[in-house]
């Protein structure tokens, strides 16, 4: 098929709506189940580019969790620790996790509040282990280059048989020129085919020039994630995954703060106080995620007040104090950070440092680069200038 009719566009009043190939050729996708919508396809095509590039850059299977045309999480298939399995709600009954399943668990688990109702993109054929993980999550749909037979049947059972499943031709290569219309005016530009790899990290401008191999992988993950995140954007990454993404902010410091708060939450969820919260057996994942988000945040009394805690816990948990949280966050180290444009002030570095950042990749080019470098030197952070902006709109 060279076009697919959609129910509507971004909003129900925006009709007619379709996706199509302007040159009359066949669409590079098959709809295996459901009826994906306009925003679903935006998430699918942006997300698939991200995971395809992650796989090419690292050689590892990759997954991303998209919401409203920005990733909530992105990761490659490195093994999970027992703690990560617990905070990502990985059920032991699934058995051994494939690398692709690990990538999906990481991508979905980094920011579970934002990933609720996500659209999933996978770099590889969806296997049974990955499908079993997805089966238990609230999700709008998935795109992948293929599906094992049993995995496809598992996914088809979601949403009362209406789960959106898209298969994309992995050999598809888009035209080098892309176009879109705004207010009746056509915009045209070359596709962003800039390749992000280790060579991009060679210009280390700080006194500390030591960037570990794992940190290089994490910086690559952060930068590729930013390439498909609405600007301005900042991404914190650690251990093969994004752990905090700040998207669509109009000031750089707000990107850094937003992404940093998400990275902090990811690490706070690993504290024994949170791991051992006494949830009632009948409390579902979404309610647990909401309760944890409140418990580790400033509004903890919203879940600990008398009359509230009884709804989700078997007994009232102790307060996770500000001092305890700060002491725990101080243990988080070796975090990598990418920025889609230069840092204009050193305050971004100071905020990043509070969330355990030790490695930074950013374009450079600010008139205050000296101040930013000086702040990195003060905090013993290794920073490289890539010379390449990664805006995405």
Regions found by a protein language model. Name each.
Residues 1-200, 215-233:
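Active-site loops and adjacent core secondary-structure elements that bind or stabilize anionic groups
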Residues 23-35, 110-116, 190-209, 287-308, ...:
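Gly-rich Lys/Arg/Thr-decorated short loops/hinges at beta-loop-alpha junctions or inter-strand turns
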Residues 53, 228, 265-269, 354, ...:
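Conserved helix-loop functional segments at active or binding sites
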Residues 57-65, 165-168, 231-238, 268-279, ...:
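Flexible, glycine/charged-enriched surface loops at secondary-structure junctions
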Residues 61-62, 67-72, 78, 233, ...:
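Glycine-rich phosphate/pyrophosphate-binding loops
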Residues 70, 126, 238-241, 249, ...:
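Active-site-proximal loop/turn and secondary-structure-junction residues that shape catalytic pockets
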Residues 72-112, 243-342:
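Glycine- and Gly-Pro-enriched alpha-helical subdomains that act as flexible
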Residues 118, 122-123, 136-166, 171-173, ...:
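C-terminal binding/interaction regions
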